[in-house]
Amino acid sequence: MNLFIFTQWYCLEEYHGAKPIIQFVILLWFLCFKVPPPDAFIVQNPPSVPTLVAVKWASSMRKLAFIVDWHNFGFTLLGLSVGRSSPFVSIYHWFEKRYGQMANGSLCVTRAMQLELAQNWGIRATVLYDQPPEFFCPTSLQEKRKLFCRLNRYLCHPLGVRDCVTAKIGADDQNESLFRTQVDTDILLKPNRPALVVSSTSWTPDEDFEILLEAAVMYDRRVAALLDENDSADEGVLWKEISGGKQYLYPRLLFIITGKGPEKEKYEEKIKRLNVKRVAFRTMWLSTEEYPLLLGSADLGVCRHTSSSGLDLPMKVVDMFGCGLPSITICYWFDF
């Protein structure tokens, strides 16, 4: 089957004045006269205006099937920039719903979105889940050992003076890391290793990093209360016991935060000022080869991406699932 798949995204901030009309004319001309005749047009939504309108008109003129691939709702994205009460959002919603109903077929990325389309839009959609690239897969023990040996020099040095995962092992030790040690040919997990939590961020104001810091402090306080520890107890004694191999009922947490962005230094300073005993943070930038290995080596993934509709599945979570990593995220109506 010969398909033409249209996935071009237009900037929502540009939907003013005559721009959508100009885009509509150019897109319609392109689809009608420049594209060799396919069997169907598949258009990714959003954007909805003018894309859905242009593709629907082109499919009608060329007598081709018109299929919409729903990844989110365009009117909810527009509402983030102009406000949900704006009349432009209502108009956009009408166009999106009306032309979505004209499709010969619909695909969507979650069952929650499928239910929303069926109940409130009158659209029957087939769920086609997003899939991660093949290199997002579980990490073998040997790959984990090599990865953490490479990262050892970063993991052993805290953002502050010292923390609960500051290790005595050498940064160049190729047989031992915070999590594993090698004895002869056997790779063994350390019994008192920290639990590894991974989150990626662009360090921008639209990503709420504060919530992760608050959760870390809450965990630290909760564990101290459950173990009936005195708040004034010297953390140095605790860390010395941990370095000596002592095991506790509740694990230490090591958060590795990956990514680059404008607010990185701001939050690194906040991390340095955290008064926690069982939680540590490391910030780093990983290569495209190392990031999937880290996901496959972690115990938990955290995604702080917020969705305008709450119905689409973030690709960060898809990547984590591909690596076999359980994930927690912010207020999604996940129904798989």
Residue ranges and their predicted role:
Residues 13-29, 81-88:
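A short, charged, and often flexible helix/loop element on the N-terminal side
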Residues 24, 38-63, 68-76:
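An aromatic- and histidine-rich active-site surface loop
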Residues 234-259, 264-293:
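Nucleotide-activated donor-binding/catalytic signature segment of Leloir-type glycosyltransferases, i.e.
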Residues 207, 285-321, 326-336:
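Nucleotide-sugar-dependent
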Residues 50-53, 57-61, 68, 86-106, ...:
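Membrane-proximal helix-turn-helix segments that form the acceptor-binding/catalytic region
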Residues 202-244, 262-265:
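A conserved mid-protein helix/loop that constitutes part of the nucleotide-sugar donor-binding site
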Residues 101-102, 107-108, 113-170:
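Helix-loop-beta element that forms the nucleotide-linked donor phosphate-binding surface
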Residues 157-171, 179-180, 186-207, 212-218, ...:
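Conserved donor-binding/catalytic core segment of Leloir-type glycosyltransferases
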